[in-house]
Amino acid sequence: VLGGPEFLGDNEEFLRKNPFVDCVFRGEGEEVFPQWLTCWNHPEQWHTVPGLCYLTPNKEYKDNGIARVLNFAGLVPPEQSRFFNWSKPFVQLETTRGCFNTCAFCVSGGEKPVRTLSIESIRERLQLIHAHGIKNVRVLDRTFNYNPRRAKELLRLFLEFHPDIRFHLEIHPALLSEELKEELSLLPKGLLHLEAGIQSLREPVLEKSRRMGKLSDALDGLRFLCALPNMETHADLIAGLPLYHLHEIFEDVRTLAGYAAGEIQLESLKLLPGTEMRRRAEELGIKYSPLPPYEVLQTHEISVSELQTARQLSRLLDGFYNTPAWQALTRELILNDEQFLHRFLAYLTKANLID
């Protein structure tokens, strides 16, 4: 019996290739897995279990759709499990599940509705986390500030645990209300670590990827976040998105350096099972690896060799711009010389310092 994001797509081929696997779950398993345990030895009843995919004794494929936990607030918090691992230096925390956005490359792009936990229940969980001496909490919400009023309430809750706990969260720079901006600017240094999922600085790329929010608003929000002296903001770009050219990636890195982003993270697109972009890969001209993590190999806009250059650029950024000791110098060189990234990358690859 298997489950997880690997099985969010069509599971028939996997089950036929792996006959030792009896069934797989698609979706959220907290409620349906216990249900399956009541009938695991009665396969004739498996059709009643939402999200279960399996082959019947006569090898007919059965697909029970996707499982969703609608009573999200009613789930037992994972921290209360006897099996919860408290030995890690951080704890992951969901305050919401699902996403308002429709990004075609994300497994949460179709997860509606967004389900939330009450502020009081989150406070109780954080008190337990704090009692175990955990110093870092990674908030798993896809878009922390999709609801500005709720985001403000959460920030005030997080403030109750300062300076003992630092919170890492993903924020959408296009959705920053003036009220939320003021709230962020007043927070103490060290409370937050922000990830700004900008993905690309090109309107056609974002539109093709079905990412909501105006690019102009996102850029204004990103400038604001990067200028805050009381927190660090990392900006993300994704190579391999439809309509995204290599020269535009270099230009976008330079723009983000001009914003003084705390880190610039450049990743290659992965076409994950169950995503709209994977279903439309042929239509969009995307070729990708059939093996996990399903990395994009080529698009109409970017060749195999250019994607390799993007991966090398990512390593350059990690080794220099994203390294505190080198960041100021690297930023200055990027901004003062339009060709610096190209020439420095060529030198590093020729010297076999980056492969």
Residue ranges and their predicted role:
Residues 27, 55, 109, 140, ...:
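Conserved residues at the C-terminal ends of beta-strands
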Residues 339-355:
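Terminal or standalone catalytic/regulatory effector modules within metabolic enzymes
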Residues 73-231:
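Radical SAM [4Fe-4S] cluster-binding motif and immediate context
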Residues 9-14, 122-126, 247-253:
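Short, acidic/polar
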Residues 148, 160-175, 179-338:
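A structural motif corresponding to the C-terminal lobe/cap of the Radical SAM core domain
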Residues 1-66:
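Glycine-rich beta-alpha loop elements in corrinoid/cobalamin-binding modules
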Residues 33-36, 154, 252:
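Structural preference for long, well-ordered alpha-helical segments in enzyme cores
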Residues 6-8, 30-32, 68-71, 100, ...:
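Short, solvent-exposed loop/turn segments at secondary-structure junctions
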